[in-house]
From Swiss-Prot:
Alphabetic keyword roster: Copper, Hydrolase, Metal-binding, Oxidoreductase, Transferase, Zinc
Residue sites binding Zn(2+) per the record: 70, 105, 122
SUPFAM superfamilies from the UniProt entry: CNF1/YfiH-like putative cysteine hydrolases (SSF64438)
Protein name: Purine nucleoside phosphorylase HI_0175
């Protein structure tokens, strides 16, 4: 069972990774380590996969799985409420596991140079545009220069085609965003979007410059990752972080 481990410089008490599609029990089209229970997969298979997630990767607890809605809502752990509709999760308590699920959208994991705060954010283009990264960072006590971010596997800039409407939504918020869109050479009126670049711009605007990752493409790495845009009916990876 493999995982993608961040290539970042963080304290040794930080545990973080993104799962791949390999090593689970789900059948096609969710082959095989699908962790999403909202995508049409067999519920028993998903339950087994979630148990494997805890056991194989040494999680200190069974995590809360958010009901992700492309919002900017953040939940702070430990959380005793009933409303799990959110797209980011933060904690400053040891062994509280933060998890988001993705299959093209950008997962961003956060920690600090002191290693006593962590967060996980699901940044689809809507949430990214609306400010889900900014809302996550608001929870941190650390100064921006002490916050560290890692971009997990997302759809890459050669595969994420959007219309002019999406371009305009981003540019209204930050004019620099236009640098992250290139006209599609094949289809007129369409653009190729770089989520990693936009997320970097947004974090830089907050004063966060310690940024890692952003070197995978879920769409093109079919053997390793689920991709909603490629397959439509598919599973979800998990991006996970906690501190001891």
């Amino acid at each position: 069972m493999q995982a993608i481990n961040p290539n970042w410089n963080v304290p040794k008490n930080i545990h973080a990774f993104t799962t791949t599609r390999e090593g689970g029990v789900s059948l096609a089209p969710y082959l095989s380590f699908n962790l999403g229970d909202h995508v049409g997969d067999n519920k028993s298979a998903v339950k087994t996969n979630r148990t494997l997630l805890v056991e194989k990767f040494g999680l200190p607890q069974t995590p809360i799985f958010l009901t992700q809605t492309h919002s900017t809502r953040v939940i702070q752990l430990p959380y005793s409420g009933q409303n799990l509709e959110a797209d980011a999760v933060y904690t400053n308590v040891p062994n509280q596991v933060c998890v988001v699920m993705t299959a093209d959208c950008l997962p961003v994991l956060f920690t600090t140079t002191s290693g006593n705060e962590v967060a996980a954010t699901h940044a689809g283009w809507r949430g990214l545009c609306d400010g889900v990264l900014e809302e996550t960072v608001k929870y941190f006590q650390a100064k921006p220069e002490d916050i560290i971010a890692w971009f997990g596997p997302a759809i890459g800039p050669k595969a994420f085609q959007v219309g002019i409407d999406v371009v305009e939504k981003f540019v209204v918020v930050d004019e620099k965003a236009k640098l992250a869109f290139q006209p599609d050479a094949i289809e007129e009126g369409k653009y190729l979007s770089n989520l990693y670049q936009i997320a970097t711009q947004r974090l830089n605007n907050l004063g966060i410059t310690q940024i890692y990752g952003g070197n995978h493409c879920t769409f093109n790495e079919k053997e390793k990752f689920f991709s909603y845009r490629r397959d439509n009916q598919t599973g979800r990876m998990a991006s996970v972080i906690w501190f001891e």
